[in-house]
Design a protein with these regions (language model features):
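A structural micro-motif
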Residues: 78-81, 119-120, 144, 177
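Metallo-beta-lactamase
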Residues: 90-165
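Acidic/His-rich, metal-assisted hydrolase cores and their charged scaffolds
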Residues: 82, 117-122, 129-136, 166, ...
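Short, well-ordered coil/turn elements that cap or connect secondary structure elements
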Residues: 2, 78, 115-116, 141-143, ...
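Active-site-proximal loop/helix segments of hydrolase catalytic cores
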Residues: 1-50, 59-76, 149-214
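Active-site HxH/HxHxD metal-binding segment of metal-dependent hydrolases
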Residues: 57, 65-113
């Protein structure tokens, strides 16, 4: 019908960080405290015409601030129809040097979703679900077909070294073309190789290469 619709996969670092006053959120070494892209992200979305009426989904790939730090602001300002956010707790990471402000950004996004009217939180993806609202990882988005991948939840009972090992990815397909948004999926446990094999991604038209080089 010619109306714009939008979806987002991550949204970048923000200026917010824990000050250490809350014992749940220590000010750990490695937490980003001097960089944020709130203004740039919001300005770009506004320039595209994103509003609270046309943002259909926000995929929070994993709880690292350089990916979802601005997520709570996005939710509060643009109230996406659905937010995809896998469960997180610091106990899911066995390498304490990689906890950073993971729980802080996760809890902030979760709170924003809970406090924003009309936003559906999806924390568990199920290929047998009847609709996107019920947790299907595959859904139509305008002329696109979206597939959310790497949503297995083994990390809930078998802790990982880093949240990158339970990081969502997104495949977008339209008009016989495909794009793969990798986020921070790596191959430490074979995730990248498995996804390429399972989804036939040996030949694609566009890939956002993550900063881990896999």
């Amino acid at each position: 019908n010619g109306q714009k619709i939008f979806g987002m996969v991550d949204s970048g670092e923000d200026w917010d960080y824990p000050d250490g006053s809350d014992p749940r959120y220590p000010l750990r070494s490695g937490i980003t405290t001097s960089t944020g892209y709130d203004d740039e992200v919001l300005s770009y979305l506004d320039s595209l015409g994103v509003t609270s009426d046309n943002l259909q989904f926000y995929v929070a790939t994993h709880p690292h601030s350089d990916h979802i730090g601005t997520g709570d602001t996005i939710v509060r300002l643009y109230s996406p129809d659905r937010v995809y956010l896998l469960p997180y707790d610091d106990s899911y990471i066995y390498n304490t040097a990689r906890l950073w402000d993971n729980l802080y950004v996760y809890d902030q996004l979760l709170t924003a979703v809970e406090e924003t009217e009309g936003v559906t939180l999806i924390q568990h993806l199920n290929p047998g679900a009847a609709s996107a609202e019920e947790g299907s990882p595959d859904f139509a988005f305008g002329n696109f077909q979206i597939q959310i991948v790497n949503y297995e939840e083994d990390y809930l009972t078998s802790p990982k070294e880093d949240a990158n090992q339970f990081c969502l990815g997104v495949i977008a397909s339209a008009n016989d073309h495909r794009a793969f948004l990798t986020s921070d999926i790596d191959d430490v446990e074979g995730d990248a190789s498995r996804i390429v094999s399972n989804y036939g991604l040996y030949s694609i038209d566009l890939m956002t290469s993550n900063h881990h080089g896999y």
